[in-house]
Amino acid sequence: PAWLVDCPCVGDDVNRLLARGEK
């Protein structure tokens, strides 16, 4: 979500979770 990406810290954490889900 855009509101999550707005925060670098949260965005980075979300990216990790998304990367895990993708694999």
UniProtKB/Swiss-Prot annotation:
Keywords: Thioether bond, Toxin. GO terms for molecular function: toxin activity. Processed by the macrocyclase-peptidase enzyme POPB to yield a toxic cyclic heptapeptide. POPB first removes 10 residues from the N-terminus. Conformational trapping of the remaining peptide forces the enzyme to release this intermediate rather than proceed to macrocyclization. The enzyme rebinds the remaining peptide in a different conformation and catalyzes macrocyclization of the N-terminal 7 residues. Coiled coil: none annotated. It comes from the Eukaryota. Residues 1, 9-23 form a propeptide. There is a cross-link at W3-C7 (2'-cysteinyl-6'-hydroxytryptophan sulfoxide (Trp-Cys)). InterPro entries: Amanitin/phalloidin (IPR027582). The keyword Glycosyltransferase does not apply. There is a cross-link at A2-P8 (Cyclopeptide (Ala-Pro)). Major toxin that belongs to the bicyclic heptapeptides called phallotoxins. Although structurally related to amatoxins, phallotoxins have a different mode of action, which is the stabilization of F-actin. Phallotoxins are poisonous when administered parenterally, but not orally because of poor absorption. Belongs to the MSDIN fungal toxin family. NCBIfam families: amanitin. This is Phallacidin proprotein. It comes from Amanita fuliginea.
